[in-house]
Amino acid sequence: MALTIPRSQYVATYGPTVGDKVRLGDTDLWATIEQDFLTKGDECKFGGGKSVRDGMAQSSTATRDNPNVLDFALTNVMIIDAKLGIIKADIGIRDGRIVGIGQAGNPDTMDNVTPNMIIGASTEVHNGAHLIATAGGIDTHIHWICPQQAQHAIENGITTMIGGGSGPADGTHATTCTPGKFNIERMFQACEALPVNIGFFGKGNCSMLEPLKEQVVAGALGLKIHEDWGATPAVIDAALKVADEMDVQVAIHTDTLNESGFLEDTMKAINGRVIHTFHTEGAGGGHAPDIIKAAMYPNVLPASTNPNRPFTVNTIDEHLDMLMVCHHLDKRVPEDVAFADSRIRPETIAAEDILHDMGVFSIMSSDSQAMGRVGEVVTRTWQTADKMKAQRGALGDEGNDNFRIKRYIAKYTINPAIAHGISQYVGSLEVGKLADIVLWKPQFFGVKPEFVMKKGFISFAKMGDPNASIPTPQPVFYRPMFGANAKANTESAVYFVSQASVDANIKAQYGIQKETLAVKGCRDVGKKDLVHNNATPEITVDTERYEVRVDGEHITCEPATKVPLAQRYFLF
């Protein structure tokens, strides 16, 4: 006999279902659940008097020898994912990977249990009702200046960090390159204790091929070209030749001063080959004043860095000071001041907001400690989305913001994964991928996760006083959990590397414990493959007034005077 309960009671017990709207933090973004995979009346819920008990939603007979038995079941959770959409489901995890999105439980007593999502005595369970699950974020613009960045990143929901450097040397302060085998090997060894997936860029600034190839063989997952090392056409061509041969990506910070050519010369050197452009607006560096035009090309995978996301009344002043420090400039030298002024343009920064909202800019990243904040990638993304809704209105959805939400979450999850050949491993909550999962209370979405899982094991979490009688008493702050400790840490995170380095067995050479996974398909992608962010309109820039036009229409917006996800959530 069926029991009918009020919708409010159902939501209070099992969380929202199809048609229910959930506000994201204190933004004006509202997510509506599009599909619910759960069978009403057979929901799995753990606790006193609840259903996940022996012989009820937990099988009495299934052992872990049965490959359909889960290690971890995250039940009744709302999922926001660029590929899966905005849905309600149980998430099943086994051997560190997502094995099912559907209905978990006991097939002996329940209908419609997804075949490989059996809850048994071997299964840990967490109630996901009233929580939002997202894929772990991916930051592709890391200056490895200090190892402490990893903790700040994971506390904002970033689980994969790609970049370069070797500590607080001048070369690392300015560029995201780990140059040469010695430095690459030491960085792999140094990062064994960090709780995130990691990939390193080799230094791509060399006009000859062999010095580039040896870095890829040493473990670089890609090459980074930076103007401070000389972003010349010869360097660009050489790096791309090696990338095409060895199936790795090239990232580029182009020539702000136009010393060796203009944007057109750089695009000619790229010659239609795929490339990932960093801070494509130009405040972080790049051909002044029109690097933003690179975003219109089908072979360019354009990214932003977060310090000018979104455009606010404080953006310009802050950037001038940051730039002087990061690129070793002197306010007493007129040429250095002119260099800084050429990069910081309110007109193109304003246009960048709109290009993100149009799906022209595809990726969000940090530029950590080098004109960017490693712990704010997720937050700045949603602040930009909220600002654009306020200034541009809805993006076609009726009564919700689902399309805009999926467009923006793709910018720091699936799209950077596609750009760097790791989308078969991370970037979404699709079945088969690593169980790198971030859980949020809706009111803290985009700011402070409840906890972060790495390969199906809890790595970081908000945690109260360890000496208290329950987990919640203050002071509550982020602490490393068992997944970030000792050998569990090396089992819960991976290194992304080139196939050539896997073939060379760098894991044994360097004596590292983390799994090494090869990047794949880096040279076969284009902007058309980027999810919800693949627009290629014609972009022009007035070189005197810096006005940006898209298909002939001038685009601009006002700087924000207030943003969400800000002081309401932080003491400082």
Curated annotation (Swiss-Prot):
Record keywords, A-Z: Cytoplasm, Hydrolase, Metal-binding, Nickel
Associated pathway: Nitrogen metabolism; urea degradation; CO(2) and NH(3) from urea (urease route): step 1/1
Entry binding sites for Ni(2+) 1: H141, H143, K224, D367
Residues that, per the record, bind substrate: H226
Co-factor requirement: Ni cation
GO MF term (any one): nickel cation binding
GO CC aspect terms: cytoplasm
Description of post-translational modifications: Carboxylation allows a single lysine to coordinate two nickel ions.
Gene3D superfamilies: Metal-dependent hydrolases, Urease, subunit C, domain 1
Record localization: Cytoplasm
Reactions this protein catalyses: urea + 2 H2O + H(+) = hydrogencarbonate + 2 NH4(+)
SUPFAM superfamilies assigned: Composite domain of metallo-dependent hydrolases, Metallo-dependent hydrolases
Sites of N6-carboxylysine modification: K224
Binding site for Ni(2+) 2: K224, H253, H279
Record-listed E.C. numbers: 3.5.1.5
GO biological processes: urea catabolic process
Family as reported in the entry's similarity comment: Belongs to the metallo-dependent hydrolases superfamily. Urease alpha subunit family.
NCBIfam families: PRK13207.1, urease_alph
Protein name: Urease subunit alpha
Gene, per the UniProt record: ureC
